[in-house]
UniProtKB/Swiss-Prot annotation:
It comes from Yarrowia lipolytica (strain CLIB 122 / E 150). Pfam families: WD40. The gene is PAC1. One of its GO terms (cellular component) is spindle pole. Residues 165-186 are annotated as: Disordered. Keywords: Cell cycle, Cell division, Coiled coil, Cytoplasm, Cytoskeleton, Microtubule, Mitosis, Repeat, Transport, WD repeat. This is Nuclear distribution protein PAC1. Positively regulates the activity of the minus-end directed microtubule motor protein dynein. Plays a central role in positioning the mitotic spindle at the bud neck during cell division. Targets cytoplasmic dynein to microtubule plus ends, thereby promoting dynein-mediated microtubule sliding along the bud cortex and consequently the movement of the mitotic spindle to the bud neck.
Length: 437
């Protein structure tokens, strides 16, 4: 029968067996015969008895090591079972989101990761346990959020990094959001993910995580600070918003600007895209604009905010969850947030559907729960708030998130099987990146 051991492992085992037997008997004839038998499988010359006797205790030591390891494994299994029981009882005591990813909401941060200056943006890698954070010092830090450790620091820009975004390649996974699962076990054949960043140094840079975050493209063309940057869903284009009052569309492959969208009368603070069909932008002029992706022509303006609009996001009806119940005929839903302390939800026809009030200062970031029931927002009032869309947008949780203004929030994309991950990141002026898990 073919051995499962290598020649070296088999030789060590034979040596240990002979050493053990040699301690039990002094019968030289028996030991010589055993030595010859044990050496035969490898085809080598008989090992001298003196050499084998030197390893007399080796087998016993290995056996004791196995016993100790087995005890440790049993002890760890016992501790794990106790921890799982405690976690289960804690979830049930907390009520909301008791073990169900569809209703889980952030409550306690798991890690606090530190920058030396304010954090402006955070973004999760679509496959790996990796988080990127953009800092006012011009650096991007890449964190392993499972370990709470920094992986690398990218000296990205000569001035503050204002936004970062990982592309989200389509894995072909189903969109069943019934359960949460880590993304650690993924195929090497995954689509390529890239990271994009923008800065007040007037450049947009694309980085390759598969090549130690090498800078693979630098996009230039804006005439002033670049406030926001986002990949389109396909990953083929990047859209950017700038203080030069324009939104630009860039080809990832060529690095060229393929379209410039005009229409705003002041600094454009935020942008988003829907299926390379529409572009959404908002800023200091208090207006959210909807433009055609292909032509750049304006389609619609959303009016209602009474102060600077800090951000805008768009969700297709298929991913909108409870938002779809607000207007069954709307093909997508727009969410905007502002320095007027409100969050507003709009239909694809431009109708205002919800106004969420509760923050005591500028609203700086909003994200939709992947299951579609909740909105999570952060603000200069140092809090993170959770809004239940099933209850008409009622605020159901207020979390003291940071010791200073909270500037950004991100929810991890679903795992490779399309299941919700209970994982949120926030960043603040206090220089902290917090992971809520």
């Amino acid at each position: 029968m073919e051995s499962l051991l290598t020649d070296k492992q088999r030789s060590d085992l034979e040596t240990s067996i002979f050493g053990y037997v040699s301690r039990l008997t002094n019968d030289e004839a028996l030991l010589s015969q055993l030595a010859a038998v044990l050496s035969q499988p490898s085809g080598s010359e008989p090992v001298p008895a003196d050499t084998l006797k030197a390893n007399a205790l080796l087998l016993e030591k290995k056996w004791l090591s196995v016993i100790r390891l087995q005890r440790k494994v049993m002890d760890l299994e016992t501790r794990l079972e106790a921890a799982e029981r405690e976690a289960s009882s804690t979830h049930k005591a907390n009520g909301l989101g008791a073990g169900d990813p569809k209703t889980w909401l952030p409550k306690t941060s798991r890690f606090s990761l530190l920058h030396k200056q304010p954090v402006n943006a955070v973004s999760f890698h679509p496959f790996h346990s990796t988080l990127a954070s953009a800092c006012e010092d011009g650096n991007i830090r890449i964190w392993d959020y499972e370990l709470g450790e920094i992986e690398t620091t990218i000296k990205a820009h000569t001035r503050g990094v204002l936004d970062v975004d990982f592309s989200q390649p389509d894995t072909g996974a189903s969109r069943d959001k019934s359960h949460d699962k880590p993304r650690a076990d993924v195929s090497h054949a995954q689509p390529r993910a890239l990271l994009v960043s923008c800065s007040s140094d007037l450049t947009i840079r694309i980085w390759d995580p598969q090549n130690e975050y090498a800078n693979v493209k630098t996009l230039t063309g804006h005439d002033h600070t670049i406030s926001a940057v986002k990949f389109t869903a396909s990953g083929n284009h990047v859209i950017s918003a700038s203080r030069d009052k324009t939104v630009r569309v860039w080809s990832v492959q060529s690095g060229y600007c393929v379209r410039t969208v005009h229409g705003h009368t002041d600094w454009v603070k935020s942008c988003a895209a829907l299926n390379e069909e529409f572009i959404f932008s908002a800023g200091i002029d208090h207006v959210t604009r909807v433009s055609e992706f292909v032509s750049g022509d304006g389609k619609m303006t959303l009016l209602g905010h009474e102060h600077v609009i800090e951000g805008v996001a768009v969700y297709p009806k298929s991913a909108a969850g409870c938002l779809a119940k607000l207007d069954k005929t709307s093909s997508y839903f727009v969410v905007s947030w502002s320095r007027d302390k409100t969050i507003r939800v709009w239909s694809s026809r431009g109708d205002p559907l919800l106004i969420l009030r509760g923050h005591d200062n500028w609203v700086r970031g909003v994200v939709l729960h992947p299951a579609g029931r909740y909105l999570v927002s952060v603000s200069d009032d140092k809090t993170m708030r959770c809004w239940d869309l099933e209850q008409g947008g009622r605020c159901i949780r207020v979390v003291d998130a940071h010791g200073h203004f909270v500037t950004c929030v991100a929810w991890a994309p679903n795992d490779v099987n399309g299941r919700v991950r209970c994982l949120v990141a926030t960043g603040g002026v206090d220089g902290q990146v917090k992971v809520w898990q």
